[in-house]
Amino acid sequence: MGWGAPLLSRMLHGPGQAGETSPVPERQSGSENPASEDRRPLEKQCSHHLYTMGQNCQRGQAVDVEPKIRPPLTEEKIDKYLYAMRLSDEILIDILTRFKKEMKNGLSRDYNPTASVKMLPTFVRSIPDGSEKGDFIALDLGGSSFRILRVQVNHEKSQNVSMESEVYDTPENIVHGSGSQLFDHVAECLGDFMEKRKIKDKKLPVGFTFSFPCRQSKIDEAVLITWTKRFKASGVEGADVVKLLNKAIKKRGDYDANIVAVVNDTVGTMMTCGYDDQQCEVGLIIGTGTNACYMEELRHIDLVEGDEGRMCINTEWGAFGDDGSLEDIRTEFDRELDRGSLNPGKQLFEKMVSGMYMGELVRLILVKMAKESLLFEGRITPELLTRGKFTTSDVAAIETDKEGVQNAKEILTRLGVEPSHDDCVSVQHVCTIVSFRSANLVAATLGAILNRLRDNKGTPRLRTTVGVDGSLYKMHPQYSRRFHKTLRRLVPDSDVRFLLSESGSGKGAAMVTAVAYRLAEQHRQIEETLSHFRLSKQALMEVKKKLRSEMEMGLRKETNSRATVKMLPSYVRSIPDGTEHGDFLALDLGGTNFRVLLVKIRSGKKRTVEMHNKIYSIPLEIMQGTGDELFDHIVSCISDFLDYMGIKGPRMPLGFTFSFPCKQTSLDCGILITWTKGFKATDCVGHDVATLLRDAVKRREEFDLDVVAVVNDTVGTMMTCAYEEPSCEIGLIVGTGSNACYMEEMKNVEMVEGNQGQMCINMEWGAFGDNGCLDDIRTDFDKVVDEYSLNSGKQRFEKMISGMYLGEIVRNILIDFTKKGFLFRGQISEPLKTRGIFETKFLSQIESDRLALLQVRAILQQLGLNSTCDDSILVKTVCGVVSKRAAQLCGAGMAAVVEKIRENRGLDHLNVTVGVDGTLYKLHPHFSRIMHQTVKELSPKCTVSFLLSEDGSGKGAALITAVGVRLRGDPTNA
């Protein structure tokens, strides 16, 4: 079936007015045989005047052209030779969709082995940020020549890159010989280059651009998958090219080289352009070969461990179609070219679009047309029949605006075919169809990458830069314009800037090396800083041992006065036994908020605890005012609660959870040793808090209270859990502050008379280390946080593990890293200077496994910190290191406690339960798991269960009050 009379007439006489529509048939997608396809009207077809600037040989595109006389070729032949390569936007969008699917398959662990588009991870994780500096060598091997460059990068005053380079030949006998010959040649050229510049003794870092498909597991290793283009050196496929090059250099023995990074030329192009434009996240080569790379989210790359950040993916899109997915658009000429190539059946997409094959495709078409007497009056010369005689540079010359037809005549004459003017115009038409198809296909595949980037970012419109290189894109007079135009139509929701790589991919290899060097140096400094937070098992065992020693000091009468871990007797001698009964008030004071509770405890067959509570806040001026103001405020809130519950009247028993270090001389007397957690109220330290509360009640003269028990929140937590689980003999709080308590044998509690039974000891372990025994593991950041705290020099262990201080440690590390230029572009913002900005909840959110980096960035943005993807990763790392140390230290402390209980009882193995409360333990995604693991590792002879206190320490205070009432035999609530 031919093109039809309307088109033939138009070709003979030229089009009518610009903008007219001619009913021209259209090739449909998915059909195997162009000659047997259905035809549909087409809006505007290109005329024969194809060298006119601004022509657009493409379906669905209006074209304004001048009339020109066309040789009367038959409609059948024109259809067969030219029209089969014409692709509509509909087909191009279909190809875009196919390539998007191929990309997904290549990234998937399950589908990658059979995927034709390999989507190779490059281990390039960052584009240049402008702070790179140094002196580098770059090798660029992969095209028609081999380049060596010396690249000096200086960023002190302005981003400045100076380069000197030399080009070396890669003769056919070398690229088709053995691998050792090839790399000996590279090593020889490198030696020559260094000799001329007198830098043989320098051992400069080397970046190696190796423009072939390689599998990498790190940045300085590249295992060749397959040769492409004209290379076929034996013994290299399946081998690490870095090792081969190092071996060749070593064999020479006259210089040494440090190969830091191997990159694909496409990655090199992206990095070269990325130095000038940090929006550049795609690299594109359209030259001898073709390929593209782009920055992919690590969470989508199954073949690489980790899910944080991005990594450059080398698509190796030249192999698109090797699985048969492009058979419907490949022509007989594509198949013939493939059969005669060095690698039949491979790189099929590349063979349809790249400069290495374009001239050959045109030659095959011309041969067939000549054989059919459609060109050159049927003359076929030996030159025309010789592969490689018609090059892509010939195609470019023939398609130039003004001299195209004349160039065609000269080129065809060189081939001995004696062309007529009409032959030259026809050949120009063939060249245009072939090169236009190439531009369209590359636009479709690049469109798929842009769509993927847009989807990854979750933005309706993408703004990005594509770094581009390659002789076809640069030298062909019409290629880039056609390519851009098609791309705009295929992906209208992307704003793309094309940045031409002026200095090739060699500079890119140097930039990758510079970035790798910068990142390695940054990584070294970051690791050095964070290593002080990473505690070995041996260090944790030492912490456990030291705490055990401090516990013994606190329990003994003779050493208690100088002990930092005070081991305070709580006078709680029994856990609940289930017979407790009555209505009790509880007061829970331990932070900026406090609770008043009514707790109704019922015993019998069905034990129940019913609670009513109200939360009140304590303003900062009262926290740091006088003691009378603080306790008057508390009593005012109790009065409000009694009115609220309608129970003001009878004298009710009250348990007072007071979460600060107190020395108790009885259950209902607690003398405040020191304020913690930001409290500073005067005239309280050294006084009995129960008496201070009773005095405030008297001053109010509204109601009376029976203060039965003063309880630490940790003891309250233990009692709450012990009511549910009788094996609970330890209490732990890890929230704003941190503390632990446990049931100690009375014989070991020298501060209280009597040797029978047990008593709960409030350890007050927050002060562990106040005597300097933990200085070997305290970091400079711990010291800064301590120095600026309200109670400098005190509660040092607590300041390393509790929620009130972890955020401050993180903030100080971030300030240090920002000063060093590792974070936030080196800019210390006002929010970062603000103490207390990093609350525990932010640490918990940032470390959540479920959060993608975009969400981490959003959290940082809420805090006024504008972060890049890399910033977010580092912030998350810092949070993780600080919270892990906290969990491990907490675990080491708990291991000391459970071991003491086991030894007290002379058991080979102890089963015990810990009642736990506190926001850090409850809300942090990893804290509890790490702490449990640490306890298990450090106390293997103990099986420790952890029970979360659901009702807080207020319920515990009521239970202790109930136990106290029961033990004193009070008839009102017996």
Swiss-Prot record:
Leader sequence segment: none
Expressed in which tissues: In rapidly growing tumor cells exhibiting high glucose catabolic rates, isoform HK1 is markedly elevated. Isoform HK1-SA, isoform HK1-SB and isoform HK1-SC are found only in spermatogenic cells. Isoform HK1-SC is detected in round spermatids, condensing spermatids and mature sperm where it is found in the head membranes, mitochondria of the midpiece and the fibrous sheath of the flagellum. Expressed within the principal piece and midpiece of sperm tail (at protein level).
Location within or outside the cell: Mitochondrion outer membrane; Cytoplasm, Cytosol
Binding-site residues for ATP 1, renumbered to this chain: 86, 140-145, 481-482
Keyword Manganese set for record: no
Major enzyme class: transferase
Sequence positions that bind D-glucose 2: 659-660, 676-677, 712-713, 738-739, 764, 798
Family of this protein: Belongs to the hexokinase family.
Name of this chain's protein: Hexokinase-1
Native source species: Mus musculus (Mouse)
Biological classification of the source: Eukaryota, Metazoa, Chordata, Craniata, Vertebrata
